[in-house]
Amino acid sequence: ALHGAADPQALLKQWHQSLQVGGFVMFSCLGPDSARELREIYQALGWPPAGHQLTDMHDWGDMLVETGFSEPVMDMERITLTYETPERLLQELRELGRNFHPARFGALRGRAWKKQLLQVLAQRLPRQADGRLALTLEVVYGHAFKAQPKIRVNALSAVSEQDMRAMLQGARSKS
């Protein structure tokens, strides 16, 4: 998953190298507002972060340009997932991936902690009109093209005396 890449800039460079000029890349990944309800609960309880920090769509656009892509277009949307129970919510979060945050709890948690987590989720997560628990995911969409390589122009150019004479003689013979 792109949002879990340890070095997204390196991944974009690989994509850029793999494409032909005129080719394009399209992607989607989770954005920083994903599971914000869960992060707020963890923070209120003084627990380590519930997930690693996700990259903002504007930063994705900047990385695309820095990598050599052109005409990046970025967009995002928020999707609300609903769950009948806290257990089902946790099951789906586990299926989506793992917590890459460097400050995450490094050991296994016990049954008492899980029981407390389930109770807190049932009490504090927002609920829909039908009583289902709600969790927001931000999905970032992007695409960009691989442009022609740019010609590097130096501030200082060198012309040999012989080339200069040839250019001057060519200009005189045309007049």
Where are each of the predicted segments found?
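A short glycine-rich, Lys/Arg-flanked "PGG" loop and its adjoining helix->strand segment in the class I
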Residues: 9-24
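Glycine-rich, phosphate-binding/catalytic loops in enzymes
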Residues: 13-15, 43-44, 161
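Conserved catalytic/acceptor-binding region of the Class I
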Residues: 22-88, 95-109
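C-terminal lobe and adjacent flexible extensions of AdoMet/dcAdoMet transferase-like proteins
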Residues: 87-175
